[in-house]
Amino acid sequence: QSLWYHYDFASAPVKLSVLAMNLGQEGGDAETRESDTQYMQTVGTYVQFTPASWNLSGSFYYQTGKNVSARKVSAFMGSVRASYSINDSWTVNVGTDYLSGSKKSDATYRAFNPLYGTHHKFYGTMDYFYASDFVNGYAPGLSDTQIGVGYKVSSSVSMGLNYHYFATGVKLESLNRTLGSELDYQLDWKIMKDVSLSVGYSLMRGTSTMDVVKGGNHKSWQDWGWVSLNVNPTLFKK
């Protein structure tokens, strides 16, 4: 069950959203073949403030209840972002996201679960985090600090470059918290009405901590490039 409320303030450039969600997940005992349902609740808010050339936003969400393994949950996430339009062409932005993590020794599960979030939109376009699971029983959370710049070449062409610094949300055993850095570049071209082209390239430089919690070999070259042709026709119009 979900409850969502959104309000646009008439007297100020402020938008406010509130979310409350109750999620039931079925689990059980493989030996007795008995099933049960564990319930976890997520509550939080998102606020956006857009005075003049600024775009400021922040969010906070808290999770409680029990996860599918029947462990008590107490987790949270927070996000703060700011962007500024220097002129009609240039934009700069900074931001930070923090998702709490859990140690293996924790009796209470403290790793925040983004659930149905649009993972590709956040935490870098290479999708190292949350679009794929952590390994070896780790749930370290995530800290993502980013800075970027956008440039509008013309009315139909724009590009952006963003840098991400990733770290675990909690300190794990003898591991360093730093996971690595990612650089994302994207160019968007509106070719004609209903047709656009997007091109991107990303580069990740990981650490030995990344190898432990995500697998792989951080010493190998890690990058990807992509091209997307988007066709969005209007089929029905009054």
Regions found by a protein language model. Name each.
Residues 9, 20-26, 51-53, 60-66, ...:
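Transmembrane beta-strands of outer-membrane beta-barrel pores
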Residues 220-238:
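Outer-membrane beta-barrel "beta-signal"
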